[in-house]
């Protein structure tokens, strides 16, 4: 059984629809504006970055997009990482394993693919909190494009507020991703 640290309450879901940054439909334009390192959350975002010639420093994938399996060619293209870590993370949750693996991936000098059994969507929040200054977290905004979230104080404050309003132990979640 997964060690769930935080769970998304239904009354908070609407706030997650508001993007944490600018929305892009052009990968090259996004990459021109992105900081370093780049953390990708989602299969399609990871695929588009790789296809544009930029393997993310850390990518979190679950082999699904908008609740359907990704195409075989997309899954096959998500390759070329120095290492792969696998974790369980049920939908609408953040588990201790996912949070610890996120921190591990950020601390590594190797590109890391975090293969999530379950759902990786909420990982955007702790990724913004945990990433170093100047980093960018890229994630998908359904039917709109890719969001480029800068890891600055404004974004971190918003993310911390969201995590603190989730059900569970926000202090533990924040501690697991802090360095």
Swiss-Prot record:
State the InterPro entries in the record: GTP-dep_dephospho-CoA_kin
What chemistry does it catalyse, as a reaction equation? 3'-dephospho-CoA + GTP = GDP + CoA + H(+)
Q: Is Ribonucleoprotein there in the keyword field? A: no
**What are the BP-aspect GO terms?**
coenzyme A biosynthetic process
Q: In which pathway does it act?
A: Cofactor biosynthesis; coenzyme A biosynthesis
EC number per UniProt: 2.7.1.237
Q: Which GO terms describe its molecular function?
A: GTP binding; kinase activity
- The superkingdom listed in its UniProt entry is Archaea
Q: Which UniProt keywords apply?
A: Coenzyme A biosynthesis, GTP-binding, Kinase, Nucleotide-binding, Transferase
Q: Which residues bind GTP?
A: 43, 45, 62, 120, 143
Q: What does this protein do?
A: Catalyzes the GTP-dependent phosphorylation of the 3'-hydroxyl group of dephosphocoenzyme A to form coenzyme A (CoA).
Family classification = Belongs to the GTP-dependent DPCK family.
Name under which the protein is recorded: GTP-dependent dephospho-CoA kinase
Q: What species is given as this protein's source? A: Haloarcula marismortui (strain ATCC 43049 / DSM 3752 / JCM 8966 / VKM B-1809) (Halobacterium marismortui)
